[in-house]
């Protein structure tokens, strides 16, 4: 599979800030990106406390073989010692 030169950033997908968009608007953004040849989405566990990743999952349903998802798992998701970083426990919890 070839990855598009441009990747769609999904930090704006979610609901924790006034500038973010939920699923309906995210679908419009993704459709436009897809129509322009973009097949890569970048997200992270800390984007809207995981909501961005949930939205991305909804967006790529049925087309998973054609899309590249880049995500990050380092971010702090809680107050415990294993709620951030790259420990095996944290990484496995995030995926």
Q: Can you say where each PLM-predicted feature lies in the sequence?
A:
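A short, structured active-site edge motif that brings together acidic residues
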Residues: 66-78
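Active-site mouth loops of central-metabolism enzymes
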Residues: 12-24, 77-92
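Short, well-ordered amphipathic alpha-helical segments that serve as non-catalytic structural scaffolds
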Residues: 29, 90-95
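N-terminal binding-site loop/beta-alpha segment at the start of enzyme catalytic domains
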Residues: 1-68
């Amino acid at each position: 599979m070839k990855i598009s030169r441009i990747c769609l950033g999904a930090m704006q997908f979610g609901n924790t800030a006034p500038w973010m968009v939920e699923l309906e608007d995210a679908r419009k953004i993704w459709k436009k990106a897809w129509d322009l040849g973009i097949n890569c989405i970048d997200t992270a566990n800390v984007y809207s406390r995981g909501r961005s990743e949930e939205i991305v999952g909804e967006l790529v349903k049925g087309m998973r073989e054609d899309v590249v998802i880049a995500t990050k798992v380092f971010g702090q998701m809680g107050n415990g010692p294993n709620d951030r970083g790259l420990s095996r426990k944290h990484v496995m919890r995030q995926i």
